[in-house]
Amino acid sequence: MAVFVGFAVAYALLIPLGNSPDELSHLNYVRLIAHHAAFPPAGVREHQQPPLVYLLGAALLRAGAPERSLRLISAAAGAAGVIAGALIARNVAPRRPVLAVGAAGFLALLPGSQFVAGSISDDSLAIAVGAWVLLVCVLVVKAPAPSGRLLAAAGVVTGAALITKQTDWAPLAALLVAIVWHWRTKLRWRHAVPLAGLPLLIAGWWYARNLVTFHSVLPPLVHGDKLQLNQARGFVSQTARSWFRPERFQGGLITLPRAGVVVEEVLIATLFAVMLYAAYRAVRAWPALQTWQRSAVVALCAAAVLAVASSFVNSATVIIQPQGRYLLTAAAAPALAAGAVLASGVVRRPRLTLTLAGLCAAAAMALSAIGLHTSLVAYG
């Protein structure tokens, strides 16, 4: 956690404002609310984004905080997302605390996530909200019957997801399916009060505003170049690399020195190998898992698959955006997989496992330092 917060705060304090993707557009959204009590109309960049993070930022500006402090909202949200990831792993495997440590480490050491958490954007809050949605999803499949507190939690995170960003819809879909399926024989009409009433209270006004302003539940989307079939390989490559390096404010990834590219490629290959081994271990362990644990794993994986699918569909039908941060809202599944591999290795070959884990962590931190230094040279 200290590494994550340290790099996020370093980006927030050292990189001049406006040098993260669309940062000035996000800042203008906040200024509109803070100084004019208005949301951006159609034609203004980022007008399609739900307003939660911008309302929080406007409150800071109205309180007299400097504009750079808006980046700290992202840093705090990023830390909350890491905590939620650890809690997900802890609840899925309560007797294996190493698994939670591995999941948190996976989320905290992603250089691209640290960069996002140091910029003015709605993505860091969306990542955090997505993680908390999936935590509630795990708690739902773990609970034999609905309780007042759990129903309220589900309603609150649903409302938060609906007013944060559309990238939260993938984990939200997993939560809603889990509620309906797992509690299908125990849901009563009275349960609709927290499950539907709280989201309406939290986010309903935003969608009503859209109907009045745009005559549509959602604001008009911004269209651009679409993903073509012959671009698929490059799209996947750039999406994967964006988990491991900063982005330019003009769009696209920042150019790393050769040493950084080598470290990045090693980490991507390692991540791929870890995911494959985690899948193998999951198949082997599946019969021994409790029913609710299987449901939790399926829900987390389904959210990840939906996030990937929605990224492809959006890029093919609206505008091409090979940005891995959009997938981090449902990153609990790969985080859990990484934690499971670590926990399994600690039992089987502790010395080798801890050595390899330490090397991976050191490589990730080195890549974070290279990315930060490269950004400082370019924009500092």
Language-model regions, residue ranges each:
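Membrane-lumen/periplasm interface segments of multi-pass, membrane-embedded glycan/lipid transferases
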Residues: 211-282
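Extracytosolic helix-loop segments that constitute the early lumenal/periplasmic catalytic or substrate-binding loops
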Residues: 7-10, 24-55, 60-62
